[in-house]
């Protein structure tokens, strides 16, 4: 079978879980994806052969990650309604994955990516000058906005994230790596 020759005819529950996780979090290590969602090696290979997934290496380590291709992101958006996260870097995204795995299904289903948050503030508040957080979710009726802070963030960038959360009316949480 050549890449892109056919599409998935039927999504299984494990496929949906894996594709949503990849769409929401960016880069995921293969073993983590398999352990968390139960997706099989064969199914991962099928998704790679269909050009929905590809393996990438972290430039700073020998770690290998899976991520959605453009075709995969389009498929996840069209079929599952997930606005896919624009990945930064595997190490950054691995912190998002770690957070995601400790959430309830309801919290995961309330997940909004940075792309969605940017569109919301643009549409609802008419602002395009605020930098949204990496993601948000609802827990106990409260909207939590989470930002993964790396060593190259300036104080100004962090303030922009806080300003965004204040404009949206939620709770700000940051994770420093």
PLM features: residue spans?
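A structural signal for well-ordered alpha-helical scaffolds and beta->alpha junctions
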Residues: 40, 92-97, 129, 158
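Nuclease-adjacent, charged terminal/linker segments that flank catalytic cores
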Residues: 1-83
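Acidic-basic catalytic patches of nuclease active cores, encompassing PD-(D/E)XK
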Residues: 80-122
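Hydrophobic, Leu/Ile/Phe/Ala-enriched alpha-helical segments that form helix-helix packing faces
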Residues: 47-48, 99-107, 162-166
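Catalytic cores of nucleic-acid endonucleases
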Residues: 143, 148-177
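Conserved catalytic cores of phosphodiester-cleaving nucleases, focusing on short active-site segments
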Residues: 99, 103, 119-154
């Amino acid at each position: 079978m050549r890449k892109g020759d056919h599409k998935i005819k039927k999504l299984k529950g494990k496929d949906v879980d894996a594709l949503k996780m990849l769409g929401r979090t960016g880069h995921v290590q293969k073993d983590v994806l398999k352990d968390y969602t139960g997706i099989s090696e064969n199914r991962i290979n099928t998704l790679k052969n269909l050009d929905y997934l590809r393996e990438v290496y972290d430039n700073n380590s020998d770690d290998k990650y899976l991520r959605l291709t453009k075709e995969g992101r389009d498929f996840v958006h069209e079929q599952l309604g997930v606005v896919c996260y624009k990945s930064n870097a595997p190490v950054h995204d691995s912190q998002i994955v770690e957070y995601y795995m400790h959430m309830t299904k309801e919290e995961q289903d309330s997940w909004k990516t940075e792309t969605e948050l940017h569109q919301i503030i643009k549409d609802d508040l008419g602002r395009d000058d605020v930098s949204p957080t990496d993601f948000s979710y609802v827990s106990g009726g409260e909207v939590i906005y989470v930002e993964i802070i790396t060593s190259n963030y300036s104080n100004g960038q962090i303030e922009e994230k806080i300003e965004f959360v204040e404009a949206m009316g939620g709770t700000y949480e940051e994770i420093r790596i």
